[in-house]
Structures are given as C-alpha cells and as structure tokens.
Amino acid sequence: VLGLPDLYETTNTGYHKTLGQWSILDYGPYNNDGNTPPSYSAYERFFMGWLTPRLITEPENVVLEDLKNNNEALLISSTDEHNLIGNDPNPTACYMLENRQQTGWDEYLPGHGLMLTKIQYSSNNWKQNTVNNSSNRMGVDLIEADGKKPNSRQNGYDGKPGDLFPAGATEYLGIADHSIEEIS
C-alpha cells in the first residue's frame, strides 16, 4: 500500500508474532470482521512523510494527544540526533511512541493507550518486503506493556489490551537508562 512494506511475516514459513490488529499493514484490515481497519500508525505515517515525530533526547514529562486527532508522535533515538526521515532513517534504530484511542477507525483495536514500537530499519528488508520475517530481528516490533510477548500467532494472537501502556503508566516507560538494543 502506497510503497509501505507489509508488516506481517510474508514467507508464511513461521508463525511468530508481528503487529497484528494494531497495524493496517498486518492483521488490522480484519478488525470488526473486515469492516473497520485501523488508522495508519505513527511509524507508517512517518515512513510516508505524513508525520514528523518530535525527537526526545532528555527525560521530560510529555502530554501526547491521540494520534488520529493530532498527528503527533515521539521518536526516541539510539543517539541524541536523528535525521527524522522515515524511509531513510539515520540512525536506523529508534522507538516511536504514539497515543492510540478506540474511536473512529481505531474503535476496534484490542485496547487503548500508549503504543511503543521498536524500529530497526534495513533498506534491504524494506525493499524485499521482508521487514518482519525474522523473529530474531523484527524491523517493526511492538513492545508489549505487560511484558507478555507471545511467541506464536498459531493460537489466534493478533493483539490484546495489555499490549499498550495505560494512561498514567509513567513507571513503565523508564527506557532512558537502556540502549535501543536492550529494550524488547
């Protein structure tokens, strides 16, 4: 769609967890029996040049409004700098933080709150449409708030309310003391 890569596993050889219902480029088009796909995520908008996230380099208190109403997101980089170019990022590893609420196109998401996505960009994987084919190095990976990362989609996993950080969950977002590679 529009030059975006698929975010589900495209080889169908393994059944590891991808973004599921949270992304229109994965299982999201099937939300509400296929009638109500979700809004594009912050990363998808960033990749297309429709959103420029605010780079966070120091600890701070932030009010992040609903993505679909305000088109705003935060980017946490592995360094204090980032070129903010979604389809050619430098550095290639970063996090996107967005607020998803169950209204409008997002009404049929499995839950609401702050969605934290880890990005590990590889131009080859994006060009070959193999972004999330390796469970060992996902290109776009949801960081589950409850810490419960399913290891398989074979049992019908496509998203759950505990995937997103609830409002006021500041104690969960202490990622500043860790490198990008350490957080999963």
Residue ranges and their predicted role:
Residues 1-50:
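The catalytic-center signature of Zn2+-dependent metalloproteases
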Residues 54-184:
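Non-catalytic C-terminal accessory/binding modules of secreted extracellular proteins
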